[in-house]
A protein has these predicted regions:
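S-adenosylmethionine-dependent methyltransferases
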Residues: 1-160
C-alpha cells in the first residue's frame, strides 16, 4: 500500500495552514515535493498560488494528484524529478523526513527555492543552519490510524 493514500499528519497540517494563511503562497510559483496525493499542492492552489508543481518520483502518485486536482477543480503541473524542476518562489515539503536518508534534501531544496517550508511529525527538531522551527500544530492522519500521540504534533520549519 503506498503511503500517500492516507492524509498523514504533516500533509494535512500543512494544507490547513496554507488555507488559513494564504499570504505565504499567494501569487507565487510553488513546488510541492513528495506530493503524494496532492493535498498540499491543491491547498496551495486554492490559497492563491499562481502556479503549483506536484513533484513525486511515483508515477501512480502523480496520477492521483491529477485525479484529485480534477475533483477539486484546480490546475496543477507535474514533475517526476526535482532536479529537472525550475527555480520556484516557495518549496513545500510535508512528511518527507521520516527516513533519515532523506535529510540531504534539506540542502537540495535550497537549490530550487529561497523560501522552503518543511512540516514533519516524526522529526521533532532537526539541527540545520539554514532552517528554523517556527511553529507546531496538531493533526491526525485521515483515516485515523490510531498512531502514537507523539506523532500528532507537527513541527513547521522555514528557511532563514
Amino acid at each position: 500500500t503506498p503511503y500517500w493514500i492516507f492524509f498523514f499528519f504533516s500533509g494535512l497540517a500543512m494544507a490547513q495552514w496554507l488555507l488559513a494563511e494564504p499570504h505565504h503562497v499567494k501569487d507565487k510559483v510553488v513546488l510541492d515535493f513528495g506530493a503524494g496525493s496532492g493535498v498540499v499542492a491543491i491547498a496551495a492552489k486554492m490559497a492563491g498560488a499562481k502556479r503549483v508543481i506536484c513533484c513525486d518520483i511515483d508515477p501512480i502518485s502523480l496520477e492521483s494528484c491529477r485525479e484529485n486536482a480534477l475533483l477539486n477543480n484546480v490546475e496543477l503541473e507535474y514533475s517526476d524529478d526535482l532536479y529537472k524542476s525550475e527555480q520556484v518562489d516557495v518549496l513545500l515539503a510535508a512528511d518527507v523526513l521520516y527516513d533519515q536518508c532523506n535529510r540531504f534534501f534539506l540542502d537540495e531544496f535550497l537549490k530550487f527555492a529561497a523560501e522552503v517550508w518543511v512540516a514533519d511529525s516524526r522529526v521533532k527538531n532537526f539541527s540545520h543552519h539554514k532552517y528554523m522551527k517556527i511553529d507546531e500544530r496538531s493533526a491526525t492522519t485521515w483515516p485515523d490510524l490510531d498512531e502514537a500521540k507523539e506523532f500528532k504534533n507537527v513541527s513547521f520549519y522555514k528557511t532563514l
